[in-house]
Amino acid sequence: NATRTPDFDDSWNLIDPHSKLVVKTVSARALWVKILQNRMETGEPYLMFEDAVNNDLPDFQKRKGLKVHHSNLCSEITLATDEERTAVCCLSSVNLEYYDEWKDHGSFIPDLIRMLDNVLTYFIDNAPSQLERAKFSAQRERSVGLGAMGFHAYLQKNDIPFESGLAGGINMEMFSHIKYNADQTTRYLAIEKGACPDDDTASVRNRSEER
């Protein structure tokens, strides 16, 4: 491995994203070690691999030449940005501790997706001119995100070991249930209210629910 040889030059330029000028040159290896050490000690920073994220962009955004350049600070949002677009977080979460109470309610996930879509509409209609790029992004892709919390509490409540095969199976069941219902809802909303303008196939209302 050439990167392990003593004479390998691992100089890494730190570039100001606005001026595009190199502001400092550091050792890539030393920087990576610092990142990993801090991650182990504090749980931060969250790491995002740009190539992997862009490979997973919806095809209709790839066709427009859009790219993800960064995430939000918590790394749960990976949306395309450029000179016209500023990413907008429109999020909600389900509480998995009570999964058994809501999983059989057919309108539970659909109502949440519809609520998030309504929040986007309110933002688009009422955002001030200073947020024009955020408004444009929200209007074009209508991205929403439905996350989850409380998985550990569900396992504790039901005396299920965290690293057990049963826990893994339950995890798969929960998130498959959420994704299926969310995907179905955004496709239904595309028929009812119209697809997001970015989607040239006119199949989805909300970009984040399409993969």
Regions found by a protein language model. Give the residues of each.
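Electropositive phosphate-/nucleotide-binding environments in soluble metabolic enzymes
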Residues: 25, 29, 85, 106, ...
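Polar, glycine-rich mid-to-C-terminal structural blocks
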Residues: 1-42
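Function-dense linear segments that define catalytic or interfacial modules
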Residues: 39-138, 150-154
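Internal maturation/activation junctions in enzymes
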Residues: 111-135, 158-209
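Inter-helical turn/loop segments and adjacent helix faces that build the functional surface
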Residues: 20-25, 97-106, 130-131, 155-173
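Conserved mixed alpha/beta core segments that line enzyme active sites in large multi-domain catalysts
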Residues: 28-35, 40, 50-74, 188-209
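A general alpha-helix detector
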Residues: 34, 150-154, 170
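Aromatic-lined, polymer-binding surfaces characteristic
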Residues: 141-148
